[in-house]
Swiss-Prot record:
Residues annotated for ATP binding in this entry: 208, 296, 327, 354-357
Organism domain of life: Bacteria
GO MF terms held by the record: ADP binding; ATP binding; phosphoglycerate kinase activity
Name of the top EC class for this enzyme: transferase
EC numbers on record: 2.7.2.3
Binding locations of substrate: 21-23, 36, 59-62, 119, 157
Organism annotation: Lactococcus lactis subsp. cremoris (strain MG1363)
Family: Belongs to the phosphoglycerate kinase family.
Compartment list: Cytoplasm
SUBUNIT field: Monomer.
Name of the molecule in the record: Phosphoglycerate kinase
Amino acid sequence: MAKLTVKDVELKGKKVLVRVDFNVPIKDGVITNDNRITAALPTIKYILEQGGRAVLFSHLGRVKEESDKAGKSLAPVAKALSEKLGQDVVFPGATRGAELEAAINELKDGEILLVENTRFEDIDGKKESKNDPELGKYWASLGDGIFVNDAFGTAHRAHASNVGISANVEKAVAGFLLENEIAYIQEAVEAPERPFVAILGGSKVSDKIGVIENLLSKADKVIIGGGMAYTFLKAQGYEIGTSLVEDDKLDLAKELLEKAAGKLILPLDHKVANAFAGYTEVKETADQNIPAGFMGLDVANKTIADYNTQLEGAKTVVWNGPVGVFENPDFQAGTVGLMEAIVKQPGVKSIIGGGDSAAAAINLGYAEKFSWISTGGGASMELLEGKVLPGLAALTEK
């Protein structure tokens, strides 16, 4: 990576500003999934071990008005982080002001402070989300000229707490998580070991047009599953019953199929039901057609066997989006079969691009078998699309 990283700067005795992604699910004050906190630990520990004084910034959820603040404080995160680090995490509960400034200035080497939810600044004019220049400058003034961005999950956004701070410090550098995310995803797409197979699931073609187009020019094969497969199948003239479809994208699907010249791999059969919820009948189809009154909710056995064939010998696999409604045990066999087919390839570099695919791998017990699971759904999508991430572009060149 051509950007400075946290290892390239002197940290001892410095107030080091760190953007992390602690946007974790919280229910009744309890964190239900702390993966993002765990993912940030290597960078935080390194800064503290080097004698830096860490000042952490993160958003949590969306905050548009005063009433949105309830349940959006980072207080539970400060507590969880303290337990993971085995040391106190100072939490003044503010995003600005004399109390916050005093607490930061009182930090000693190896100590840590967490600023309150950066999106509390969105209540008055969306200052965080719109990258207000004064806010970026103010937050930058709280440190000693070093900013570490370790929040890959927000790297595709230009906010005050990443791009804004970066513009007002001497050195803006990447943390270990951001560095790894870029290395795995960008290298997989730009310089893959071949054969390179991309797998795209999810519900809408419209969400992934740019990704499909970019990957068709880079990958040896692009496997399409999930809800968006039905738009492609309808474009080819197959019956899709009541399955999810984007009729306004049929011409685009035809164009992509022509451009793909055999590279796009679609399901060969389906597991269908007579309703999405409250269904009374589930069955498998004999081929690519889906009968009237039924909707496709997963792929079936012929397709799973085909996944094994298509992935045979693959050296690089990038997967974004499940191929069925994996949250429902009736419709998770396709996603499980796909994961099995990926992880059994010898010497494969296997990367999951965040979001629902990451949840599927974690919930179904496959996480440890993949080379890398991204922490940022939107950011990884934009990298797969070949876009430049603002949070990364704002970092200091080596």
